[in-house]
Amino acid sequence: ATFFDPQPRLLAD
């Protein structure tokens, strides 16, 4: 995910 991804769960991707 990107830094501004609306879904925080994707930040761990």
From Swiss-Prot:
Q: In which tissues is it expressed?
A: Plasma.
User: What post-translational events are described?
Assistant: Glycosylated.
- Where does this one sit in the cell? Secreted
- Organism superkingdom: Eukaryota
Q: Where are the transmembrane segments?
A: none
Primary residence:
secreted
GO (cellular component) term, any one: extracellular region
Q: Which UniProt keywords apply?
A: Glycoprotein, Immunoglobulin domain, Secreted
Subunit structure, as described in the record:
Interacts with CRISP3.
Name the UniProt record assigns to this protein: Alpha-1B-glycoprotein
